[in-house]
Amino acid sequence: EQGYHDIHSELTASDTERLTDEEKAFILNNFFSSKFETMIYRSENYKNLYQKRFSKDVATLEDFSAQELSDLMALFNLVWIDPAHFARYPRLEELWEKQYNYTQEDRIEILSIQKSIIREIIPTYKKYIEEGRIELSTSPYYHAILPILIDVKASVKSVLTTEGLPANLGMLDDAKYQIKSALDRIEEIFGVRPKGMWPPELCLGPKTLGLLSKAGVKWTISDEGVLANSINFDFIRDFKGNLNDPYHLLKVYEYQTKENSIDIIFRDRSIPNLINFEYAGINPKMAAGDLYEKIKMIQNKLLVSPDKTHLLTIASDCENCWENYQNDGIEFLENIYSLIENDESLETVLI
């Protein structure tokens, strides 16, 4: 009746006095799915409920009152809202400060604010696209690994064993459909046809590049390991992970197909790993400073380059990392963006 389409929202909006045992079990098994150090720990009540749930091997349904289940669902939804939105929605701050004795009406209000935030996403992206501040790329519609669909026999060159692979998958038409459907859908939603496409698992091959180019894709991306194999070059790093020679990695490569051409950029592998797995655990200002120093070190090594400009690609295909940061990484992002923005020798660009 409230228009919810997922079990988490349906339960959040429900009357906790009328929950079935099955629903209570689902809540206890799923509404603690939050990072403890950066999300659960922020709330004294949420932390206490977590400890009650996991302090013994088996927590029975009878251990939790209807009010505790109500608080659990309210706090779960609140910690998954980016802290930046609390300043924009004062009511969120009021609901967060409450911490205890949440009502069904409170929980429904939290869901309503969530919907308001979600409704802003597409208009905000459209605005930034129109202003030239961002560029959208897409992936094949169902995240298909294109080289396997196009030619599984060619793909076996990159795997250790062919066991379990079909003899000849032969799904070229499906690969074309995956590409076109993704481009069409993004254009339908945002009013702009993407120029770039992110290949799932960063897998590329000559036939894949040909299909992308024929579909109107202007650029795509892969990993430094793919580039190393393609140009027979070893990207050697020092003990801190800095490239000894970054020149080849900071270029845009043009691949000529039979009919067209497509640009390929290759990401630095080390920097995304730092953002995804290391920087969350240190002071955000220090983390931003370390990243900035690495960028400047790369820049300094290119002072004798014959090229006037170079492109450092920082691209992550990891699961969302920001929940590992305090405040969803706001301080880290603000610091690194500020450092880059105030450096006249650096410029963020569209591809």
Regions of interest found by a model, annotated:
Residues 1, 140-143, 196-205, 225:
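Short, solvent-exposed turn/loop segments enriched in Gly/Ser/Thr/Pro and often Arg
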Residues 164-201, 296-315:
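CE4/NodB-like, metal-dependent polysaccharide N-deacetylase domain
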Residues 123-138, 153-155, 212-214, 254-260, ...:
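Acidic (Asp/Glu)-rich catalytic clusters
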Residues 219-237, 249-252, 288-351:
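C-terminal domain-boundary segment and adjacent tail
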Residues 137-139, 197, 212, 265, ...:
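Conserved, mostly hydrophobic/aromatic
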Residues 103-108, 157-171, 191-195, 272-281, ...:
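Glycine- and acidic
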Residues 1-159:
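N-terminal catalytic cores of secreted or lumenal carbohydrate-active enzymes
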Residues 2-37, 156-176, 213-256:
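Acidic, His- and aromatic-enriched active-site or binding-groove loops in soluble protein domains
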